[in-house]
A protein has these predicted regions:
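Residue-level detector of conserved, function-critical positions
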Residues: 1-234
Length: 234
């Protein structure tokens, strides 16, 4: 059986393979299978991970578990502590957190018990000394973080700033450009942190094959190209 073809039911209570129910049981919740063929499930005994045959990977049960990314899975222990485990069910580091994300590019955002966010590496080590009000996933070596001032900046994998500009809100880069908001509205910026056009929008989306959906300040919906020129009005 090819685990990549295993699907979750629409109500997320069981698994299907080529339209047939797997493992002969319903769960409270099932999540998708991830490499190398492991899925997170929740039943009356608690949260745990199973392989493609439906066999639990370990005996311990958690309050909740999530999928594997970079060979690490986020779990919530019964005392409320969040941390990561490896594919054998072994805890990856000693520290517990108020929340942990999923590893992306071998780095992960975490929320400290006393408040604030940081990034940890695959061994649970902080990658910089700063504590931020918020931080997100790394994508292509860059993450968006919220400073104590409330503004957002882009940082690289070593914690240094990618460019000198701060914004009211800031997304990660997608195909060379990121969405950003200043006091005038939303725009797209390049890797230097500068806007790629002069106009501002009420709402925008990342570029998709050279085009992006935007809502003008007057409410008109458009599609623009990477020069900021209107391709069509919707």
């Amino acid at each position: 059986m090819d685990w990549k073809k295993i699907e979750t039911s629409l109500d997320n209570t069981h698994y299907l393979y080529e339209g047939r129910r797997l493992f002969g049981k319903n769960f409270i919740e099932v999540l998708n299978f991830h490499t190398p063929g492991i899925a997170a499930v929740l039943d009356a005994s608690g949260g745990y991970h199973i392989d493609a045959s439906g066999t639990p990977l370990y005996a311990h049960r958690y309050c909740r578990v999530f999928g594997y990314y970079c060979s690490r899975a986020a779990v919530v222990d019964n005392d409320g502590a969040w941390y990561h485990i490896d594919e054998h069910g072994t805890r990856s580091y000693e520290q517990g957190y108020a929340w942990v994300g999923n590893y992306q590019e071998a780095l992960c955002p975490v929320r400290l018990a006393g408040g604030g966010y940081k990034h940890i590496d695959i061994n649970g080590t902080y990658i910089y000394p700063e504590v931020y009000r918020y931080c997100g996933d790394f994508k292509d070596g860059v993450s968006s973080v919220r400073l104590s001032s409330g503004l957002y900046r882009h940082i690289t994998r070593d914690g240094s700033y990618l460019h000198p500009y701060a914004y009211e809100s800031l997304g990660v880069y997608h195909k060379r450009y990121a969405i950003a908001q200043d006091l005038e509205g939303w725009m797209h910026i390049d890797k230097s942190g500068k806007p790629i056009y002069t106009q501002r929008y009420l709402r925008i989306e990342p570029f998709y094959n050279g085009m992006a959906f935007v809502v003008r300040l007057d409410g008109v919906q458009q599609v623009i190209d990477e020069r900021g020129e209107c391709v069509c009005v919707l």
